[in-house]
From Swiss-Prot:
Record protein name field: Non-specific lipid-transfer protein
Family: Belongs to the plant LTP family.
Signal peptide location: 1-26
Function field: Plant non-specific lipid-transfer proteins transfer phospholipids as well as galactolipids across membranes. May play a role in wax or cutin deposition in the cell walls of expanding epidermal cells and certain secretory tissues. Also has fungicide activity.
Manganese is among the record's keywords: no
SUPFAM superfamilies tied to this protein: Bifunctional inhibitor/lipid-transfer protein/seed storage 2S albumin
Keywords for the protein's UniProt record, in alphabetical order: Antimicrobial, Disulfide bond, Fungicide, Lipid-binding, Plant defense, Signal, Transport
GO molecular function: lipid binding
Presence of keyword Transport: yes
Length: 117
């Protein structure tokens, strides 16, 4: 009888843990914008990316784990780049390297986001 109660308790506990477990944060354009906002100064001419900028790049790179996430991030980056005046696209392309991050595609307004895997 005690083992039956234990099994029921364990099942209930596991179900509660599954329901209460936080969902993975999906990539959104809002997330991309907030992570990369500290980089705007560098992209518009400041001499080097700030620690906050590189932290955002690293965080975004870690969050974009799936191909769908990377495609979304790419699309958001392209959209944001066209709405911000004075972006130096050469600096944008070098930003991941400047921050020690490897990105599997070129950072460019001409990048085909649908080809990202």
């Amino acid at each position: 009888m005690a083992s039956s109660a234990f099994v029921k308790f364990t099942c209930a506990l596991v179900m509660c843990m599954m329901v209460a477990a936080p969902l993975a944060e999906a990539i959104t354009c809002g997330l991309v914008a907030s992570k990369l906002a500290p980089c705007i100064g560098y992209l518009q001419g400041a001499p080097g990316p700030s620690a906050a900028c590189c932290g955002g790049i690293k965080s975004l790179n870690s969050a974009a784990a799936s191909p769908a996430d990377r495609k979304t991030a790419c699309t958001c980056l392209k959209s944001a780049a066209t709405s911000i005046k004075g972006i130096n696209y050469g600096k944008a392309a070098s930003l991941p390297r400047q921050c020690g991050v490897s990105v599997p595609y070129a950072i460019s307004p001409n990048t085909n986001c649908n080809a990202i895997h």
